[in-house]
Amino acid sequence: VNFGFEQNLFLDTPSTLLMILAYTFQIYFDFSGYSDMAIGLGKMFNIELPVNFNSPYKACSVKELWQRWHMTLSRFFIQYVYIPMGGSRKGKARTIFNTFMVFFLSGLWHGANWTYIAWGSMQGLLVIWDNLGIVSVKGSNEKMPAKWYIPRWLGWIFTFGFFNLSLIFFGSSSMTAAIQLFKNIFAFKNTGYLFKLAANLDIPEFYLIKQVLTLKFPDMLQYAYVVLFLLLLIISAVVISRKNTLQMVAENPFRKKLCAWVVFIFVWSVISFSQVSTFIYFNF
């Protein structure tokens, strides 16, 4: 992902799309994982910390996504920005303005960069659109009836696709870099740069396979990296489609099989340490 954002001038359409998809998974697993760790550590000291994520990538509208993503920050902005500005008590126009300001300030909160402002503004505009009730997802819990309804699967595709594209602004260092990535997507070109992008996946578990391929089948190594990249994306997609950790623990607080898997993954993770991995949200 880091390599992709740095080399934005050279990416083609497939490599840009897959890089952004990888970033979408990375930022969620990074932040949600640390939030779960904090909740677990809190329980060790008999401190109940609030849930911060509730499977946001299962949302079928942008409004629903923000009811599931970084819920503590959302509550903060609602309590200290949205409600003091009048909330939804002063007419539709004021409600729209207040909603937009919440997301505008949320973008600014992440950093004084036009990319964050663009990202926050995009979220605000789509949440406002959802609030207008023109189009809604079938089976949603909206109080006001909508003019048109779409299937949940279509709502999910739009929501997940929109959030993917919006993260181009969030992850880019400048507006110029973000615009370049959009140009790459809509250029509809395939220059084979995906092979170079995937070659940056240098994980310890792949070391033995890499050595064998280098010695015996050097021409196959670049394809192996692409397969590994796609496999990681598929695994990530499967994980977010299943029950989250809090749901699993709530259904069955203690299972020997689950505990054994947790211990195994923890030990494996420690053994696989090869470099310092920074917490993305630590910067905000």
Model-predicted segments: where are they?
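Aromatic-enriched
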Residues: 235-237
